[in-house]
C-alpha cells in the first residue's frame, strides 16, 4: 500500500538521478579511456618515427638536430636600439617591413639555414626568402602572447567605456525620476496647502475646551428641539388624519341619516346639524392655525436663541481663550485625579468583597469535607466492628457447634 520505502533513500539504484549519475560517470570513464588510447597510439607512432630516424642515422645519414633557437635570433644586433624596435613591433607600433627587407639582416637570418629541417633529409640548403621570414615571424609565440595581451587590454578598455556609459544613463534616469518625484510632491504640497487654508478659513483658529463643550451642548439642545418639533409635527399630522377620517365617517353617517330622513319625513333640526358641523370645522381650523402660529413662533425663538448662544459662545471663547486655558487644564487634571481615586476605591472595595466571598466559600467547602470525612470514618468503623465480630465468632465456635450446624446438610446428603 505504501510502496517500497527504499525508493525514498537517496542511494537507491532505481532512482532516476542515481541512474543519470552512473550514466554520466560511465560516459566520462569511456571518454577518458579513448583519450588514453589516442595518446598511446601517438606515442607509439612517435616512437616508431624516432626508431626510423635512429636507423637512418646508423646507416650513415645526416644527424638531425632538434633546435628552435632560430625563432629567437635577433635580425639586427649591431644597432643599440634593437630592443625598443622589437618591442614596438610586437606591440604593433612599428612596421616590420623596413627591418626584414635589409640585405645584411637577411644574410644574418640565413646563417642557420644549413641546420634547418631540410638538411636532415640530405636536401640542398633552402634559401630563406621574405615570405618564409614573415611566416616565421608570425609564428613567433611571444608575438602571439603580446597580441593576446593587446586584445585583452582593448576589450577591457571597451568594457570600461560601456560600463561608464551605462552608469551615466542610469544616473540620468535616476535624475529624471527624482525631478518627477519632486514635482509630484510639490503639486501635492500645494494641494494640501490649499485644502489646509480652506479648512482654516472654514473653522475657528483655536477653541478652548469650554467653548467646545458649550458648542457641543448647544448642538445637543438644537438636536433635541428639532426632534421635539418633529414629534409635535407628527403628532399634529396624526391628529389631523384621525380627525379627517372620523369626519369622513361622520359625514357619511350624516348623509345616510339625511337620506333616510328625507325619504321618511323632513325634520326641522336639519339646519341645527349643519350649523353645528360648520362650527366644528371653524373650531378645528382655528385650533390648527393657532398651533401652526405657536410652532412658527417657537422655531423663530429657537433660531434667535441659537444665534444669540453661538455669538455669546464665540465672544466668550475669544475673550476667555487665554485666561481660562490654565484653569481648564487644572480642572481637567483634578477631575482625572478624582476619577482615578474613585476607581481605586471601587477596585479596593471589589477586592475586599471578593476576598470575603472566597473565605466564606473556603469555609463551606472545608466544613463539607470534614462532614464527609466523619461519615466515612463512622461507616468504616461500623464495617470493621461487624467483620471483627464475625472473626471472633468463628474463632469461638467449637467442633460440636459446627457439626450441629452442618447436620442438616449431612442428612440431606444421606437421603
From Swiss-Prot:
<feature type="region of interest" description="Disordered">
    <location>
        <begin position="154"/>
        <end position="415"/>
    </location>
</feature>
<keyword id="KW-0747">Spliceosome</keyword>
<feature type="compositionally biased region" description="Basic residues">
    <location>
        <begin position="194"/>
        <end position="208"/>
    </location>
</feature>
<keyword id="KW-0175">Coiled coil</keyword>
<feature type="compositionally biased region" description="Basic and acidic residues">
    <location>
        <begin position="154"/>
        <end position="180"/>
    </location>
</feature>
<dbReference type="Pfam" id="PF12542">
    <property type="entry name" value="CWC25"/>
</dbReference>
<dbReference type="InterPro" id="IPR022209">
    <property type="entry name" value="CWC25"/>
</dbReference>
<feature type="coiled-coil region">
    <location>
        <begin position="15"/>
        <end position="59"/>
    </location>
</feature>
<feature type="compositionally biased region" description="Basic and acidic residues">
    <location>
        <begin position="209"/>
        <end position="260"/>
    </location>
</feature>
<dbReference type="GO" id="GO:0005684">
    <property type="term" value="C:U2-type spliceosomal complex"/>
</dbReference>
<feature type="compositionally biased region" description="Basic and acidic residues">
    <location>
        <begin position="355"/>
        <end position="383"/>
    </location>
</feature>
<keyword id="KW-0508">mRNA splicing</keyword>
<comment type="function">
    <text>Involved in pre-mRNA splicing.</text>
</comment>
<protein>
    <recommendedName>
        <fullName>Pre-mRNA-splicing factor cwc25</fullName>
    </recommendedName>
</protein>
<dbReference type="GO" id="GO:0000398">
    <property type="term" value="P:mRNA splicing, via spliceosome"/>
</dbReference>
<feature type="compositionally biased region" description="Basic and acidic residues">
    <location>
        <begin position="267"/>
        <end position="318"/>
    </location>
</feature>
<dbReference type="Pfam" id="PF10197">
    <property type="entry name" value="Cir_N"/>
</dbReference>
<keyword id="KW-0539">Nucleus</keyword>
<keyword id="KW-0507">mRNA processing</keyword>
<dbReference type="InterPro" id="IPR051376">
    <property type="entry name" value="CWC25_splicing_factor"/>
</dbReference>
<comment type="similarity">
    <text>Belongs to the CWC25 family.</text>
</comment>
<dbReference type="InterPro" id="IPR019339">
    <property type="entry name" value="CIR_N_dom"/>
</dbReference>
<comment type="subunit">
    <text>Associated with the spliceosome.</text>
</comment>
Amino acid at each position: 500500500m505504501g510502496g517500497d520505502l527504499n525508493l525514498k533513500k537517496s542511494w537507491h539504484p532505481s532512482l532516476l538521478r542515481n541512474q543519470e549519475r552512473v550514466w554520466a560517470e560511465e560516459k566520462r570513464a569511456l571518454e577518458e579511456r579513448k583519450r588514453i588510447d589516442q595518446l598511446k597510439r601517438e606515442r607509439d607512432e612517435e616512437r616508431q618515427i624516432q626508431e626510423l630516424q635512429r636507423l637512418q642515422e646508423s646507416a650513415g645519414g645526416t644527424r638531425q638536430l632538434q633546435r628552435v633557437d632560430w625563432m629567437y635570433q635577433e635580425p639586427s644586433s649591431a644597432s643599440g636600439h634593437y630592443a625598443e624596435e622589437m618591442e614596438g613591433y610586437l606591440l604593433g607600433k612599428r612596421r616590420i617591413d623596413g627591418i626584414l627587407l635589409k640585405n645584411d639582416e637577411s644574410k644574418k637570418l640565413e646563417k642557420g639555414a644549413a641546420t634547418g629541417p631540410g638538411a636532415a633529409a640530405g636536401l640542398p640548403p633552402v634559401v630563406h626568402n621574405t615570405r618564409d621570414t614573415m611566416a616565421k615571424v608570425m609564428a613567433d609565440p611571444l608575438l602571439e602572447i603580446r597580441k593576446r595581451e593587446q586584445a585583452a587590454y582593448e576589450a577591457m578598455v571597451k568594457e570600461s567605456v560601456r560600463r561608464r556609459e551605462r552608469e551615466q544613463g542610469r544616473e540620468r534616469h535616476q535624475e529624471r525620476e527624482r525631478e518627477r518625484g519632486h514635482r509630484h510632491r510639490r503639486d501635492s504640497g500645494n494641494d494640501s496647502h490649499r485644502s489646509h487654508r480652506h479648512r482654516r478659513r472654514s473653522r475657528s483658529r483655536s477653541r478652548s475646551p469650554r467653548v467646545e463643550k458649550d458648542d457641543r451642548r448647544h448642538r445637543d439642545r438644537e438636536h433635541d428641539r428639532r426632534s421635539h418639533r418633529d414629534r409635535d409635527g407628527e403628532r399634529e399630522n396624526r391628529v389631523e388624519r384621525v380627525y379627517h377620517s372620523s369626519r369622513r365617517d361622520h359625514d357619511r353617517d350624516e348623509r345616510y341619516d339625511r337620506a333616510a330622513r328625507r325619504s321618511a319625513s323632513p325634520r326641522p333640526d336639519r339646519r341645527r346639524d349643519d350649523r353645528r358641523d360648520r362650527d366644528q370645522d371653524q373650531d378645528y381650523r382655528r385650533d390648527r392655525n393657532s398651533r401652526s402660529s405657536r410652532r412658527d413662533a417657537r422655531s423663530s425663538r429657537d433660531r434667535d436663541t441659537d444665534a444669540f448662544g453661538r455669538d455669546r459662545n464665540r465672544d466668550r471663547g475669544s475673550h476667555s481663550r487665554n485666561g481660562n486655558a490654565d484653569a481648564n487644564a487644572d480642572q481637567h487634571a483634578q477631575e482625572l485625579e478624582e476619577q482615578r481615586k474613585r476607581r481605586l476605591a471601587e477596585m479596593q472595595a471589589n477586592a475586599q468583597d471578593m476576598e470575603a466571598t472566597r473565605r466564606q466559600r473556603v469555609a463551606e467547602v472545608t466544613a463539607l469535607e470534614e462532614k464527609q470525612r466523619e461519615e466515612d470514618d463512622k461507616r468504616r468503623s461500623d464495617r470493621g466492628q461487624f467483620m471483627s465480630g464475625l472473626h471472633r465468632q468463628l474463632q469461638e465456635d467449637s467442633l460440636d457447634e459446627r457439626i450441629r450446624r452442618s447436620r442438616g446438610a449431612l442428612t440431606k446428603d444421606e437421603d
